[in-house]
Amino acid sequence: MASPSRQPPPGGSGLLQGSRARSYGSLVQSACSPVRERRLEHQLEPGDTLAGLALKYGVTMEQIKRANRLYTNDSIFLKKTLYIPILTEPRDLFNGLDSEEEKDGEEKVHPSNSEVWPHSTERKKQETGAGRANGEVLPTPGQETPTPIHDLSASDFLKKLDSQISLSKKAAAQKLKKGENGVPGEDAGLHLSSPWMQQRAVLGPVPLTRTSRTRTLRDQEDEIFKL
């Protein structure tokens, strides 16, 4: 017969005294760890897979395997339920102690309507008073400002363009007429205003004077042509 296994004496020294021995790398959740997990129990159905459960709950397949101590994908059907680890934020662990501080911060950032409303009404009164002093008419909140109409049809645009072209043609023709009528008079006034031109008009054309130099130059040209 097999001998019964020995049990350690109560109160003895060793690894099993007061706590369970764990190997290196075991999944131990530390009390000081800021990341905590909340496990959700899922009833397995015939069409469930690890990938589908991971997508459904927003976790990874490795986390589901680690939480249920699974080593293959086919072993999930050996169990009726699976534990899905869901991470919880660290501030949820304070049991609402920091909720009052958050509310106070929100009240400081977002003031109440009773504090904002008087400032807005005073600003509107100042703007209306300045507009009346300058003679400007400010629109009331219920009244919309009339928007100027700038949209023209194609026919109106072409008519406007034709009228502008005709006006520019008339102005150019008038300028040409004024130039043709005014140039001869101006030239005559310029010619008569100068004393040299007046003297030339009275005496007539000035005859060319023949000097000895001109004669010698002409004789040299004749000799060149003869050669």
UniProtKB/Swiss-Prot annotation:
It comes from the Eukaryota. The keyword Phosphoprotein applies. Pfam families: LysM. InterPro entries: LYSM1-4, LysM_dom, LysM_dom_sf. GO terms for cellular component: nucleoplasm. The modification Phosphoserine is found at S23, S33, S99, S166, S194, S212. Residues 1-11 have a biased composition (Pro residues). Residues 40-84 form the LysM domain. Keywords: Phosphoprotein. The keyword Phosphoprotein applies. Residues 1-22, 97-150 are annotated as: Disordered. This is LysM and putative peptidoglycan-binding domain-containing protein 1.
